[in-house]
Every structure is written in C-alpha cells, then in structure tokens.
UniProtKB/Swiss-Prot annotation:
PROSITE patterns, alphabetized: RDRP_SSRNA_NEG_SEG (PS50525)
Family listed: Belongs to the influenza viruses polymerase PB1 family.
Protein name listed in UniProt: RNA-directed RNA polymerase catalytic subunit
Entry's Gene Ontology BP terms: DNA-templated transcription; symbiont-mediated suppression of host gene expression; symbiont-mediated suppression of host mRNA transcription via inhibition of RNA polymerase II activity; viral RNA genome replication; viral transcription
Keywords: Eukaryotic host gene expression shutoff by virus, Eukaryotic host transcription shutoff by virus, Host cytoplasm, Host gene expression shutoff by virus, Host nucleus, Host-virus interaction, Inhibition of host RNA polymerase II by virus, Nucleotide-binding, Nucleotidyltransferase, Phosphoprotein, RNA-directed RNA polymerase, Transferase, Viral RNA replication, Viral transcription
Subcellular localization, as worded in the UniProt entry: Host nucleus; Host cytoplasm
Length: 757
C-alpha cells in the first residue's frame, strides 16, 4: 500500500509536523571499539571546568584530587564548576520556606523505606561493574559475587537480607587491612582437533584466590567502570557513561529515594513522573504563568540547554544539600545518606579496554590496556590522543583515573533536579523583589524557564539574573543552545508545547514493527503499540489503520507466513498451503499460520487467539492450545507479559501486552557458544541463582508472600513453611501419615546439614 507523503501534511498545522524532522527512523548509531578515548575526554573536560580549584591528595589511595567548591566567581561565560556552598544552602533554605515541611516529610518516608528495603533491590539494573572480576556483569551476578567475597572475609551482616545491613558490611570492608577475592582467569593452549586435524585454541577457566591490600581494595570499591553510550540519535560524537560497583550502588539508591520523594512534592520537577502525568504537571505551570501575566505583562519562555550538566555538578555540593535536608534527623540516617556523595568525591574512573593498534605491513594487532597508558611511549599515538594521555597522566592509578569533581551521567538525576528546582523557586516576586519574576520546569539537566515582566528590559534582566544565580551553584545555562520565545511555544524533554502539548509521534517510531521475540508475542506487542499510540500520541484512525496494515505486511514477511491462498513462494509456503486447504474455517487460522488478518482499529485490545477462537476448527484449537503439545511453553503463563520497547530517547520502556500460551509462544534456546568461554562459570552461577529463586517461589506463592520480617535465611524460611503446610495438609487429610513423617524427616536433615556447614 503506497502512500504519497505530501498528502499527510495537507491539513496538518506546521508545529505538528515538527516530529518529521527528528532523526528517529532507521537504525540508531552504535559505537565500536573501546570507550577509552571518550572516558579520557570526560575526565579531562571535568578537570578543565574546575581547573582553578584546590589540589589535594587522598591519604588512603594516593589519588590527586581537585576541589573547585567555593572557587573563584566566574568572570566570563565559560562553563565552570565553582559552586558556592553558602549559595546552595540558601537556595535549599528558600525551597523549604516555600514548601513547609517538605524535607522533614521526605526524610520520614525515606527512613521507612531504608528499614524495609531488601538487598535484592540491587539485582535490578543492567550491567554493573563487578569489582571482584574487574569487569562488567549482570547486576544479580555482581551482587552475588560481592556477598560471597564479603562472607569469605568474615562479613556477615548482609545475610539478614536487609540492604542497610549489607551497607554496614561495605563500610566495614573499607577498614579491613586486606580482602581476599576469587578471580577468574583464562588459560589458552593450542591443541590439534581430532576431527579436522587442524590446530585450535582451547580455553579453560580457572579460579584463583587473590589478596587485595587496603589501597587496592579501596580503589576498586570507588571505581566506576565506563562504557560508550550506544544508540544516541542526532549526535556526531559518542560519549562515555559510567556503571558503579556494588559498594556505591546501595548508598546511591537511598540518596535517590530521598530526592525522589522531594521531587514528587515539587510542582516544577519533571521527575519522577513520565508520560501523560508529566504533561499535565507541565501544563499546570504554564497555565499559572499565562493567567498571572495580565494584559500589562509580557511572558517569555526559554527552551533551555545546560552545558555539560554532569561535569560541572559536584558531589561535595550534594553532600552539603544532604547535610541540610537531613539536619534534624537521627545520626545513623544522616550518615547513611552522606556516604554516597563522599564516595563520589573520591571516585575513580576506569578507562575501559585501552587502545587497539594494528600494523598494516606486518598484519599484527595488539591491545594496549589502560593500565599501560601511564608508562607507554607516546610516539605511537596520533596528535589528539597524545594530548589526552599527557593531560590525564598525573591522575592515573592502576589503569583508573582519579575523578573527584563532576558526576558521571545518570547517577544523581533526582538530587540534581532538586538543585535545579531550588533555583527556579527563587523566581517568585517575594524573592526577586522587583518587577520581573520567573518559574519553570526542571528534569535532570533539561529545563524550561518562563519569565514574566512588564517590558522587554525586564525580561532581559530576569533572564540575566537567573543565568547568574545558576552560575553560583555550578549550573551553566548555554547561551548558544538556549532560545527564547513568546510563552506558548517551547520544548521540554522532547515534549513540544504549542498552546498545549503536541504529540511528538516520531519518538515512538522505533517501537513500531516486529520485535522478534516469537510469533505470538510479536503479534500482541505490535497491535498494543498501535493501540497505545492511539490513546497517548494522537495517532489518528486513518493512520492507525495504515500502520496496522503495514505491520501485518511486515509480520508476514518476517515469519514467512503469507496467506494460504497467496502466490508468494517461501520456505514455509508449502506447509501453510497444505494447512489452508485442509482447514474448514479458514478465518480461524492465526496470521502466523497463513490465516487472514481480522484486526482493525476497534479490536486491537483482544489477543488474536481469543479474537479467532470461535472461528477455529476443533482440531486446530486442540493443536494450538493443548498443554500436552510438546511445542507449548510449559511455564505458568501470566495473563500479562512485559515487553521491552525502544522509544527514541530515554531508556527502553517496559510495555505490558496480553499473553496467551500457544504453540507459537516458543522461547529460543541460549546460544551454545557461551559454554566454551570464560562466561561459563557465570552462567552456572546464574542458573543456580535461578533454580533457588524458582524453588523459593514454589514455597511462597505470590498470594501468601509478605515482606520477610525479622531475620531468617531463604532455607530457614522454606523449611518452616514446609512444616506448616505439611501439618495443615496432614490434619485436613490431604496427605497420609507416612508422607507427613517423611517431610518432617527431610526438614530435620536439611537443618542438620546447615548446622554442620
């Protein structure tokens, strides 16, 4: 079905067409090779912004550290990180004055959460720097390794399962003179393959014990591993992002919990809400400014952009903020919250894999690991890399760079939003004490500023004052990249406002199409995406109908399941034709079995199996949904599954879709090649972990699962649960006396084994 694109724009107001200018179709750019160069850029830039600060040396690690706090006031428009402590504290005080009790209440909420959070909270999240192996791992594995090492070093608070107790272990681990860890290493040897008689490299994995002295351990505990941010659209250059290790994560989580609680109470904060809720919040602020700017007042809005937000923020400022916010709280709570910023003030950035060199003439390739950058002769490098390495050298220790100023990307989004909002809050007339006043929206580093004043000079004065106030707390509004407009037209976090929010539909484009999970899930996700966009993003009925037809076409090509009566020849067409001919009710065949498409924009909410169930031949129903059919997935199917969809910006979103278990909901098997690599040990750990969790869930069906109170291990919990259940089953006659006795005996044996261990 071909569409002439100009027809789409005949009746579209220009501002609605903005989304077509976004770089969101096609594949996003990915990075290849190492992120070492990007990381060095980040470290060097961060130090450059704070270069007039004071240098000190960390007594424990020997790392040189730069402290720009209370540094010189800026004299030009260059970005700088010289935040003034007293200004930040004053901004906090005014924020509290305009929102009485906000900090107090948020602290109380956070304290409750701190006491209830289980350590398994840290298994959420993707790649995490695993300090025991000195590389990235899935979060759950990294946590398991950390706890295992702590345990073998005599730290056992974490076994109670509360996150706060685990953090006590982290604190104690930093005082230890040495830590013993188990690391994996690879042995490679050349052997002759019996079958092919060729020489092949065989890899074996060994585990070895290694002792880290206090200094080496501290460096690892304070290390953030760095990677290149992938799939960033609309940028020419890539940039580095950081993943912290398990020691830092728990502390950051609690700080962000507190900051999130504060953000929820601030009308100018674009976090932590999203989607329609966020739009409503923003529209409120705009409405307030529009109604208050009577006929006599002008109102202008700046679509703001800050220069290098993260690199000019400073953990020492965050420490000052936390100290102020928690000032009337118990000592233990203040201590727990102040550790994250302190660790960040002493952080080390791991430089990644290093550089790859190749000699074209000799056909040689060699990797220069980051550890060697401190001592290698610079003549091998090109001009720009040489400059980078020269600048970073004084900061290097064991392949990591000391990075005291700056916050790596995405670490304290909520807390930095609180700082931004505190400056927006100073725009009230009672604080500006003049004819201009401002308000706005802040979401991490993105902001929109609305300034009202009786005339243009007043607007200019207001913007200048805002700009200078920001400078005092280390926020640098970019004069080049921010632009000002009459209020009513602006952009904030990729939402476009034009007398109301315009749907920026292009952002959703990447999530249209076939996901590639399996035939059943893909069909369901595809129609759900279209349905959601009709609800949330102004996807009109005609366009939705077209999107649906394109999706079905795409789906049929992906799975080679063209209609049974089609002329198209594929590998599956022979079988599908046969099925088509022997089916009485052809409308009942699923699209993936060569059936017709019965979806239209009215029935997108119904799973395809349900939509066609009444139309199916009986034997087809039996094959499709028979639990004894070996191709039907046997795990208990929830009625709702979660798919990961990729919107154009921001992290992958989780989207719910209806799941019906059929022969089409297969799960692909894991690639075998992983079994021959260094990851094999990790895979076994992961499977072990999985088995334990599955077993635990068998004992505690979700209905009876309460947050564990008191301190007991998973095994103890399961044993006591087994005893209770057995007794109830025995007394109600569901099990015989012999079975009851056998269960009790097994429980005792398990307890005995635990005691011996």
């Amino acid at each position: 079905m071909d569409v002439n694109p100009t027809l789409l724009f005949l009746k579209v107001p220009a501002q609605n067409a903005i989304s077509t200018t976004f770089p969101y179709t096609g594949d996003p750019p990915y990075s290849h090779g190492t992120g070492t160069g990007y990381t060095m850029d980040t470290v060097n830039r961060t130090h450059q912004y704070s270069e007039k600060g004071k240098w000190t040396t960390n007594t424990e690690t020997g790392a040189p550290q730069l402290n720009p706090i209370d540094g010189p006031l800026p004299e030009d428009n260059e970005p700088s990180g010289y935040a003034q402590t007293d200004c930040v504290l004053e901004a906090m005080a005014f924020l509290e004055e305009s929102h009485p009790g906000i900090f107090e209440n948020s602290c109380l909420e956070t304290m409750e959460i701190v006491q209830q959070t289980r350590v398994d909270k840290l298994t959420q999240g993707r790649q995490t720097y695993d300090w025991t192996l000195n590389r990235n791992q899935p979060a759950a594995t990294a946590l398991a390794n950390t706890i295992e090492v702590f345990r073998s070093n005599g730290l056992t608070a974490n076994e109670s399962g509360r996150l706060i107790d685990s953090l006590k272990d982290v604190m104690e681990s930093m005082d230890k003179e040495e830590m013993e860890i188990t690391t994996h290493f690879q042995r490679k040897r050349r052997v002759r393959d019996n079958m092919t008689k060729k020489m092949v490299t065989q890899r074996t994995i060994g585990k070895k014990k290694q002792r880290l002295n206090k200094r080496s351990y501290l460096i690892r505990a304070l290390t953030l591993n760095t990677m290149t941010k992938d799939a960033e659209r609309g940028k020419l250059k890539r940039r580095a992002i950081a993943t912290p290790g398990m020691q830092i994560r728990g502390f950051v989580y609690f700080v962000e919990t507190l900051a999130r609680s504060i953000c929820e109470k601030l009308e100018q904060s674009g976090l932590p809400v999203g989607g329609n809720e966020k739009k409503a919040k923003l529209a409120n602020v705009v409405r307030k400014m529009m109604t208050n700017s009577q006929d006599t007042e002008l109102s202008f809005t700046i679509t703001g952009d800050n220069t290098k937000w993260n690199e000019n923020q400073n953990p020492r400022m965050f420490l000052a903020m936390i100290t102020y916010i928690t000032r009337n709280q118990p000592e233990w709570f203040r201590n727990v919250l102040s550790i994250a910023p302190i660790m960040f003030s002493n952080k080390m950035a791991r430089l990644g894999k290093g550089y790859m060199f190749e000699s074209k003439s000799m056909k040689l390739r060699t990797q220069i690991p980051a550890e060697m950058l401190a001592s290698i002769d610079l003549k091998y490098f090109n001009e720009s890399t040489r400059k980078k390495i020269e600048r970073i050298r004084p900061l290097l220790i064991d392949g990591t760079a000391s990075l005291s100023p700056g916050m790596m990307m995405g670490m304290f989004n909520m807390l930095s939003t609180v700082l931004g909002v505190s400056i927006l809050n100073l725009g009230q007339k009672r604080y500006t004490k003049t004819t201009y006043w401002w308000d706005g929206l802040q979401s991490s580093d993105d902001f929109a500023l609305i300034v009202n004043a009786p005339n243009h000079e007043g607007i200019q004065a207001g913007v200048d004052r805002f700009y200078r106030t920001c400078k005092l707390v280390g926020i640098n509004m970019s004069k080049k990249k921010s632009y000002i407009n009459r209020t009513g037209t602006f952009e904030f976090t990729s939402f476009f406002y034009r007398y109301g929010f315009v749907a920026n539909f292009s952002m959703e484009l990447p999530s249209f199409g076939v996901s590639g999970i399996n035939e059943s899930a893909d069909m369901s996700i595809g129609v759900t995406v279209i349905k959601n966009n009709m609800i949330n993003n102004d996807l009109g009925p005609a366009t939705a109908q077209m999107a649906l037809q394109l999706f079905i076409k795409d789906y049929r090509y992906t799975y080679r399941c063209h209609r049974g009566d089609t002329q198209i020849q594929t590998r599956r067409s022979f079988e599908l034709k046969k099925l088509w001919e022997q089916t009485r009710s052809k409308a009942g065949l699923l699209v993936s079995d060569g059936g017709p498409n019965l979806y239209n924009i009215r029935n997108l909410h119904i799973p395809e199996v349900c939509l066609k169930w009444e139309l199916m031949d009986e034997d087809y129903q039996g094959r499709l949904c028979n639990p004894l059919n070996p191709f039907v997935s046997h795990k208990e199917i929830e009625s709702v599954n979660n798919a990961v969809v990729m919107p154009a910006h921001g992290p992958a979103k989780s989207m719910e879709y209806d799941a019906v278990a059929t022969t089409h909901s297969w799960i692909p098997k894991r690639n075998r090649s992983i079994l021959n690599t260094s990851q094999r040990g990790i895979l076994e750990d992961e499977q072990m972990y999985q088995k334990c969790c599955n077993l635990f869930e068998k004992f505690f069906p979700s209905s009876s699962y309460r947050r564990p109170v008191g301190i007991s291990s998973m095994v103890e919990a399961m044993v006591s649960r087994a005893r209770i259940d057995a007794r109830i089953d025995f007394e109600s006659g569901r099990i015989k006396k012999e079975e009851f006795a056998e269960i009790m005996k097994i429980c005792s044996t398990i307890e005995e084994l635990r005691r011996q261990k």
